[in-house]
Amino acid sequence: MLTFSFLTLFPELLAPFAAEAIVGKARERGLVDVNLVNMRDFAQNRHLKVDDTPYGGGAGMVIRVDVAERALHSLPPADEVILFTPAGERFTQQVAEELAGRQHLAFLCGRYEGFDARVEGLVTRELSIGDFVMMGGEAAAACVLEAVARLVPGVLGDPESHQADSFSSGLLDYPEYTRPAEWQGQPVPEVLKGGNHAAVAAWRRAQALERTWRRRPDLLPDAGLTPQDTATLLELGVSQEELDVWGAPPAPVKRHRKRRPETTESAS
């Protein structure tokens, strides 16, 4: 079982994410657990104050490192102690897959002006969900919980559900359709209704390649492109120069079957 421990000043912000939908069901089945730790419980003062003014002056308040340390020491040993910070490593699908293999993850969710810099000595990893600033780490924590928990074996009903997701294959996901078969003049592609699984798989791969090329071409160098992918991208209008930059393999060589020469029987 994978346990998520979130150290926060506002556990009520994370409680719904831990109790509802797929994560909530996974907790009921004993596949994951979520531990919400209120850092105010470790303040050791009458007013439960966890922050103080910054040395050197400046606006805002800074969360004390001794409070964070006591909160961490109240937990069982963690495989990773993670701090959410704009300076951290970018959180990606690859990182999510790595974290899903752990047993216990502890997360420090900051507020105000963040933590005393000495908290860096308590953490094993720093993560960022993007180049923007929020009011606290709880929203980032919810993102990581959702992304990692769904990768734990058994959490999703279909064990292959996440393997075709955007980024898991190195590409953006292909478009999905359901009923009605036609809506406001927009029909479901015929290939999806024909029952030919090989044709459906080829169509989906081509759609994923096109979406990625048009929207996130930066993903293609690391997407593990195949020779058939190269052929598909060339048909879409991608130049050979771009493909070379991405390290794409050569497209398959189309072999034309040679016609056997006609033979004439000699007259007897």
Curated annotation (Swiss-Prot):
S-adenosyl-L-methionine binds at residues 110, 129-134. Residues 246-268 are annotated as: Disordered. It catalyses: guanosine(37) in tRNA + S-adenosyl-L-methionine = N(1)-methylguanosine(37) in tRNA + S-adenosyl-L-homocysteine + H(+). GO terms for molecular function: tRNA (guanine(37)-N1)-methyltransferase activity. InterPro entries: Alpha/beta_knot_MTases (IPR029028), tRNA_m1G_MeTrfase_C_sf (IPR023148), tRNA_m1G_MeTrfase_TrmD (IPR002649), tRNA_m1G_MTases_N (IPR029026), tRNA_MeTrfase_TRMD/TRM10 (IPR016009). It is found in: Cytoplasm. One of its GO terms (biological process) is tRNA N1-guanine methylation. It holds the Pfam family tRNA_m1G_MT. Gene3D superfamilies: 3.40.1280.10, tRNA(m1g37)methyltransferase, domain 2. One of its GO terms (cellular component) is cytosol. The keyword Disulfide bond does not apply. Its EC number is 2.1.1.228. Keywords: Cytoplasm, Methyltransferase, S-adenosyl-L-methionine, Transferase, tRNA processing. PANTHER family: TRNA (GUANINE-N(1)-)-METHYLTRANSFERASE. Specifically methylates guanosine-37 in various tRNAs. Belongs to the RNA methyltransferase TrmD family. Homodimer. This is tRNA (guanine-N(1)-)-methyltransferase.
